[in-house]
Amino acid sequence: MNIRHVLRTLALVAIVAAGLQFARAAGQPGTVKGYVIDSSCAFTKGLSKPISSECAVACAKAGSQLVILTSAGTIYWPISDATPAVGQNSRLVEFAGKMVVVKGKVYQRSGSRAIVISSVDAAK
């Protein structure tokens, strides 16, 4: 095997890896069902659902970011794909403490999950 062949193979592997990384970063359409809960309680209290809607609203109004907590315990961070990015609490606060179905573009990176919201509806 000559050095030119090795370099071509390495270049091809790098191009494929970059393409896969880009595809993963692009996000996929998805649906998430879970409770709208403030991020502090989701992490520090180990809750499986919000204490109350009033508590979640109060925390959101105090600046805590609202997240979606699934029944499996997965936390989805609502994010914006706008530049500059904008917070998503205003889209979720009316559902704080309640079960919702969120549709949008789902992203995953190093164990973290996020969703760019296209629609939010109360779960039935």
Residue map of PLM features:
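OB-fold and OB-like single-stranded nucleic-acid-recognition modules
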Residues: 21-124
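Bacterial N-terminal signal peptides that target proteins for export
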Residues: 1-11, 18
